[in-house]
Amino acid sequence: MSLELPVLADLRMNLVPPDVVESTNAAALVADPIRASILAMLRDGPVCVCEMAAALGERQNNVSNHLARLREAGLVRTSRHGADTRRVYYERDESACAVALGALRDVLG
């Protein structure tokens, strides 16, 4: 059974635009409990990986892997603070997080 052309046109109108798909992909990363916890920790400002790992009770390399995924999605960024410039701090990219949240709202209505 094939769909009539007007029905297909109506269905296509409800497809998610590519920019929203990209934002929902970023938002989907937050479905992981560790990544959600990381983003919550970063709410108040930059935190280094070693502090996050200790707070989460996770190995540092595991937390680093989660941070890499969040960074690839643009949800977090890195910086170096203080005298010890070897230590990398992570912070949320608030505008990217807002876009991802808005995309979820658009999809879920």
Regions found by a protein language model. Give the residues of each.
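N-terminal helix-turn-helix DNA-binding core of bacterial DNA-binding proteins
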Residues: 21-59, 83-95
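Conserved segment of winged-helix/HTH DNA-binding domains
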Residues: 88-109
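Residues within the DNA-recognition helix of helix-turn-helix
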Residues: 66
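Alpha-helical DNA-recognition elements
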Residues: 69
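Short beta-strand "wing" residues that participate in macromolecule-binding interfaces
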Residues: 77-78
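Short, Lys/Arg-enriched N-terminal segment that forms or immediately precedes the first helix
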Residues: 7-27
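Glycine-centered, phosphate/nucleic-acid-interacting loop/turn motifs that mediate DNA/RNA or nucleotide
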Residues: 74
